Amino acid sequence: MCFPVGGLLPYLALRSVAYICVFGDSSRAPDLIREAFESPHFKRFDGAGTYKEAKGRCGMRFADVVNGAFGQISDMADKVGKGEPEVWCIWKKRGEVEMLLKVKEYRKGYGSGKRRRR
Protein backbone atom coordinates (compact mmCIF):
# COMPACT_ATOMS: atom_id res chain seq x y z
CA MET A 1 0.00 0.00 0.00
CA CYS A 2 1.36 3.41 -0.95
CA PHE A 3 0.71 6.31 1.43
CA PRO A 4 0.75 9.93 0.32
CA VAL A 5 3.61 12.30 1.14
CA GLY A 6 3.57 13.02 4.87
CA GLY A 7 2.25 9.62 5.96
CA LEU A 8 -1.08 8.04 6.71
CA LEU A 9 -2.07 10.10 9.77
CA PRO A 10 -2.11 13.51 8.05
CA TYR A 11 -3.85 11.96 5.05
CA LEU A 12 -6.63 10.49 7.21
CA ALA A 13 -6.99 13.72 9.17
CA LEU A 14 -7.19 15.80 6.01
CA ARG A 15 -9.63 13.36 4.43
CA SER A 16 -11.90 13.56 7.49
CA VAL A 17 -11.76 17.36 7.60
CA ALA A 18 -12.41 17.64 3.87
CA TYR A 19 -15.41 15.31 3.89
CA ILE A 20 -16.88 17.08 6.93
CA CYS A 21 -16.25 20.65 5.77
CA VAL A 22 -17.11 20.39 2.07
CA PHE A 23 -20.85 20.92 1.83
CA GLY A 24 -23.07 19.01 -0.57
CA ASP A 25 -20.78 18.31 -3.49
CA SER A 26 -18.77 15.23 -2.54
CA SER A 27 -16.68 15.48 -5.72
CA ARG A 28 -15.03 18.63 -4.29
CA ALA A 29 -13.55 16.77 -1.29
CA PRO A 30 -10.99 14.68 -3.26
CA ASP A 31 -9.98 17.82 -5.18
CA LEU A 32 -9.45 19.65 -1.89
CA ILE A 33 -7.38 16.75 -0.52
CA ARG A 34 -5.22 16.59 -3.66
CA GLU A 35 -4.77 20.38 -3.68
CA ALA A 36 -3.80 20.43 0.00
CA PHE A 37 -1.24 17.63 -0.35
CA GLU A 38 0.46 19.59 -3.12
CA SER A 39 0.63 22.79 -1.04
CA PRO A 40 3.92 23.79 0.63
CA HIS A 41 2.15 24.04 4.02
CA PHE A 42 1.46 20.32 4.05
CA LYS A 43 4.98 19.25 3.13
CA ARG A 44 6.29 20.80 6.37
CA PHE A 45 4.13 18.57 8.62
CA ASP A 46 6.02 15.74 10.33
CA GLY A 47 3.77 14.08 12.91
CA ALA A 48 6.10 11.16 13.64
CA GLY A 49 9.11 13.45 14.12
CA THR A 50 7.13 15.69 16.44
CA TYR A 51 6.02 12.68 18.47
CA LYS A 52 9.54 11.23 18.76
CA GLU A 53 11.11 14.56 19.76
CA ALA A 54 8.60 15.47 22.48
CA LYS A 55 7.71 12.02 23.84
CA GLY A 56 10.09 11.98 26.81
CA ARG A 57 10.26 15.69 27.61
CA CYS A 58 6.68 16.87 27.81
CA GLY A 59 4.77 13.59 27.88
CA MET A 60 3.22 14.03 24.45
CA ARG A 61 0.80 11.25 23.64
CA PHE A 62 -0.27 9.90 20.27
CA ALA A 63 -3.64 11.64 20.78
CA ASP A 64 -1.76 14.96 20.98
CA VAL A 65 -0.14 14.26 17.62
CA VAL A 66 -3.52 13.39 16.11
CA ASN A 67 -5.06 16.58 17.52
CA GLY A 68 -2.10 18.57 16.23
CA ALA A 69 -2.52 17.03 12.78
CA PHE A 70 -6.21 17.92 12.73
CA GLY A 71 -5.44 21.47 13.86
CA GLN A 72 -2.77 22.00 11.20
CA ILE A 73 -4.89 20.45 8.50
CA SER A 74 -7.98 22.46 9.36
CA ASP A 75 -5.84 25.62 9.19
CA MET A 76 -4.48 24.43 5.86
CA ALA A 77 -7.98 23.75 4.58
CA ASP A 78 -8.79 27.40 5.29
CA LYS A 79 -5.90 28.50 3.08
CA VAL A 80 -6.56 26.03 0.26
CA GLY A 81 -9.61 26.28 -1.96
CA LYS A 82 -10.81 29.73 -0.99
CA GLY A 83 -13.55 29.61 -3.62
CA GLU A 84 -17.14 29.74 -2.47
CA PRO A 85 -18.71 26.25 -2.28
CA GLU A 86 -21.21 25.56 -5.03
CA VAL A 87 -23.96 24.81 -2.51
CA TRP A 88 -23.63 28.29 -0.99
CA CYS A 89 -23.99 29.80 -4.47
CA ILE A 90 -27.17 27.79 -5.04
CA TRP A 91 -28.58 28.84 -1.66
CA LYS A 92 -27.72 32.48 -2.33
CA LYS A 93 -29.35 32.36 -5.77
CA ARG A 94 -32.41 30.65 -4.35
CA GLY A 95 -32.69 33.35 -1.68
CA GLU A 96 -32.30 36.09 -4.28
CA VAL A 97 -34.99 34.53 -6.48
CA GLU A 98 -37.36 34.23 -3.52
CA MET A 99 -36.75 37.87 -2.62
CA LEU A 100 -37.40 38.98 -6.22
CA LEU A 101 -40.65 36.99 -6.28
CA LYS A 102 -41.75 38.66 -3.04
CA VAL A 103 -40.98 42.09 -4.49
CA LYS A 104 -42.89 41.19 -7.65
CA GLU A 105 -45.92 40.06 -5.63
CA TYR A 106 -45.74 43.22 -3.56
CA ARG A 107 -45.68 45.38 -6.68
CA LYS A 108 -48.68 43.54 -8.13
CA GLY A 109 -50.79 44.29 -5.09
CA TYR A 110 -49.58 47.70 -4.01
CA GLY A 111 -47.34 49.27 -6.61
CA SER A 112 -49.75 49.29 -9.55
CA GLY A 113 -51.95 52.08 -8.24
CA LYS A 114 -54.38 49.80 -6.44
CA ARG A 115 -54.86 50.64 -2.83
CA ARG A 116 -55.99 48.22 -0.23
CA ARG A 117 -59.15 49.27 1.58
CA ARG A 118 -59.37 48.89 5.31
UniProtKB/Swiss-Prot annotation:
Please give the superkingdom of this protein's source. Answer: Eukaryota
Entry's family note: Belongs to the UPF0329 family.
- The name of this protein is UPF0329 protein ECU03_0030/ECU05_0040/ECU06_0010/ECU06_1710/ECU11_0010
Q: Which organism is it from?
A: Encephalitozoon cuniculi (strain GB-M1)
